[in-house]
Amino acid sequence: MIELSHEEELRYNRQIILKSVDFDGQEKLKASKMLIVGLGGLGCAASQYLAAAGVGNLTLLDFDTVSLSNLQRQVLHCDARLNMPKVESAKIALEQINPHINIETINAKLDEEKLAEIIPHFDIVLDCTDNVEIRNQLDRQCNHMKVPLISGAAIRMEGQVSVFTYEPNTPTYRDLSKLFRQNVLSCVEAGVLAPIVGIVGCIQALEAIKVRLKIGKNLCGRLLMIDGFSMNIREIKLPTNME
């Protein structure tokens, strides 16, 4: 059984005093294994709060390197680490945030066969990518392995978050993508305002913790939509098995 050190008890005190977390929940977070796919704006925001919250084992997956245009919103990276693999840059920053956790990196673009090999080793997967092909691969494999997927997206001044637990009669990312039949733009094409990716990434981290600890009401079956321009936040119910 994994236990907290005295220093960790002090570090996580403000979470431990929450009745829904307590010592048992914090120890469960320490024992947890989460995969973060994409270390751009969403992944940077989500990973730093998961690290700070004491998720004991984070694996960072990305195949890109840090560029100057990333620094406007990808807050774990910096000028000194330009051209460094994003996973290595993020690891350096996260280890400074919390030296008590274990951080592994995968600097590669994994095909679906390789994703199928690694996903069963995790309790939660966070989809922080802007790549439709990878999103669909993660959805298929997480669905097959019944590993919860926390999905986020942000563009312009808009963001969205949903949770897929793959329990019976719950929607998948495939259902969501069918609901929004449209061409997917990237930040390169449409632009993005920095704070919106932080908001979405933080919500992803929050939902990951809630799902792992089985607390609160998570976003399974719902899509949270954030319009930063008008500061309007709404949700829609997602259909299941949409043809």
Swiss-Prot record:
Keywords: ATP-binding, Molybdenum cofactor biosynthesis, Nucleotide-binding, Nucleotidyltransferase, Transferase
Catalyzed reaction equations: [molybdopterin-synthase sulfur-carrier protein]-C-terminal Gly-Gly + ATP + H(+) = [molybdopterin-synthase sulfur-carrier protein]-C-terminal Gly-Gly-AMP + diphosphate
First-tier enzyme category under EC: transferase
Entry EC number(s): 2.7.7.80
InterPro entries listed in its UniProt record: Mopterin_Synthase_Sase_MoeB, ThiF/MoeB/HesA, ThiF_NAD_FAD-bd, Ubiquitin-activating_enz
One annotated Gene Ontology cellular component of this protein: cytosol
Transmembrane regions listed in the UniProt entry: none
Gene Ontology BP terms: Mo-molybdopterin cofactor biosynthetic process
Pathway: Cofactor biosynthesis; molybdopterin biosynthesis
SUPFAM superfamilies, alphabetized: Activating enzymes of the ubiquitin-like proteins (SSF69572)
GO molecular function, one term: ATP binding
List of residues binding ATP: 41, 62, 69-73, 86, 130-131
Family: Belongs to the HesA/MoeB/ThiF family.
The protein's role, per its UniProt record: Catalyzes the adenylation by ATP of the carboxyl group of the C-terminal glycine of sulfur carrier protein MoaD.
Subunit structure: Homodimer. Forms a stable heterotetrameric complex of 2 MoeB and 2 MoaD during adenylation of MoaD.
This protein's name: Molybdopterin-synthase adenylyltransferase
Organism, scientific name: Haemophilus influenzae (strain ATCC 51907 / DSM 11121 / KW20 / Rd)
